[in-house]
Amino acid sequence: MKARILFFITLSLLLVRCKDSESLIPDPVVFDASAFVEVEDLQGNPIAGVKIKVGDYQGFTDDDGVLFLKEIEMNPATYLTAEKTGYFHGSRRFYPSAGRISTVKLVLMTEQLVGTIQPGTGGTVQVGDGIVLDFPANAIVDEDGQAFSGAVSVYAQPIMADDPDLYYKMPGDLVGAREDDTRTGMASFGMVAVELRSGSGEVLQIKGGSTVEMKMEIPSSLIASAPSTVPMWYFDEESGWWKEEGEATLVGNEYVANLPHFSYWNCDAPFETVKWGATFVYEDGSTASQVEVC
């Protein structure tokens, strides 16, 4: 992928072939279709044994990181998930056609330990080169909502806005639900995946009423187009859509936001989608398949 990331994102939004309705609920239409699913790690190596789920169907990738979904039930906005221990949640919302074969590529990110904090004092954690998380004191709870006092392991991965693999790493697609439940396209200025765990592996969260400050550096190529404020979005793994919650403020070359819970977070400017489609052909007039649009 060689084009600038914003251009790629815009085209990926156009390719979703949005309906005139602004609802996020797909049409109640089902049909049989097929999909070729390919899963890689951050180094481009195939990942075997990834559990792929589409509706009631599930299967596992082979040694080449591949699974072929043959003539299974899909809908016009099919949600596919990819899970394997040691990796962050992976998923894609794609737009198949009856009787056709779709191609879905995913890059799963390892759950990278980026730091350890003590809940009583809080602390600052660096995620990659461009994201900082600042935890306040006494802000971590266990799965039952009780205050947690042990060491907290912070696992995280950044997805910077100029990452050429952004679309393959991110979950879902770049369509989200606004606070009024209407649908919108999204142009990303960066994302981050974060999980908190105890020493025994218990999933932890931020205490209700508390927030973690996030500072996300914006690539220099995007500073000129960065709004003074943009909505923040978290990814709802159950529904498969990004959902608006809060906003980020531009301070220098960073967006600053306060996050009330953890999952994937996305710093995105909303924009209207349009209905768009195209057929690609070779010089001899034959139809081209699996064309990457950049």
Can you describe what each PLM-predicted range is?
Residues D20-P26, A35, D63-D64, K105-V127, ...:
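Proteolytic cleavage junctions
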Residues F68-A77, T85, E217-S225:
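Short Pro-Gly-centered beta-turn/loop motif in secreted/extracellular proteins
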Residues V50-V54, L80, V154, M232, ...:
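Hydrophobic beta-strand segments
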Residues K51-F68:
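Short, acidic Ser/Thr/Gly-rich low-complexity loop/linker segments typical of extracellular
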Residues K2-F8:
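Sec-dependent signal peptide recognition
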Residues L14-R17:
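C-terminal motif of bacterial Sec signal peptides marking the signal peptidase cleavage site
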